[in-house]
């Protein structure tokens, strides 16, 4: 029963999404495939803090495809607070050579 509900929800979400470049994100995923995603941020406030690192790895069935992993440093617009450095060990000088947020989303 949830199959048709999921398809209906994805269709509605796709129509609501104005930027057609990203509409594929609402397509049904391939069966048995997943992506494990990890993000490091400058803090926990979704309105003010930024992503500064993204890691992703593809999983197919029971296999983790480490050869298809993605590791990105993302250049923040603001500062990297000392509190977040203690958590993920990424300093401002580590992420300054990173890609822009927009480029990171495209690569992801």
Q: Residue locations for each model-derived region?
A:
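Conserved non-catalytic scaffold segment of RNase H-like nuclease domains
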Residues: 4, 11-108
């Amino acid at each position: 029963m949830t199959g048709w509900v999921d398809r209906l929800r994805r269709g509605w979400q796709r129509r609501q999404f104005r930027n057609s470049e990203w509409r594929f994100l609402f397509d049904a995923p391939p069966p048995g495939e997943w992506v494990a995603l990890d993000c490091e941020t400058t803090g926990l406030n979704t309105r003010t803090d930024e992503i500064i690192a993204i890691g992703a790895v593809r999983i197919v069935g029971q296999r983790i495809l480490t050869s298809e992993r993605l590791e990105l440093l993302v250049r923040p617009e603001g500062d990297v607070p000392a509190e977040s450095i203690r958590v993920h060990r990424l300093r401002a000088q580590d992420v300054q050579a990173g890609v822009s947020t927009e480029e990171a989303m495209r690569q992801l």
